[in-house]
């Protein structure tokens, strides 16, 4: 039937989008952590 196809497609899309957003979220966390590390090591307290 047509409905199982739509449901299956929806589930597939949901999983893919979930993984994408998860990867994006992890990527942003790593990126921000990297930036804060650069900020911390990039200047002495006197210079900040």
Curated annotation (Swiss-Prot):
Taxonomy, superkingdom: Eukaryota
Subcellular location: Secreted
Keyword Heme applies: no
Tissue specificity comment: Expressed by the skin glands.
Sorted UniProt keywords: Amphibian defense peptide, Antibiotic, Antimicrobial, Disulfide bond, Secreted
GO cellular component, one term: extracellular region
Chief localization: secreted
Disulfides per UniProt: 43-48
GO biological process, one term: defense response to Gram-negative bacterium
Keyword Disulfide bond: yes
Family stated for the protein in its record: Belongs to the frog skin active peptide (FSAP) family. Brevinin subfamily.
Role description: Antimicrobial activity against Gram-negative bacterium E.coli.
The protein, known as: Palustrin-3b
Organism (species): Lithobates palustris
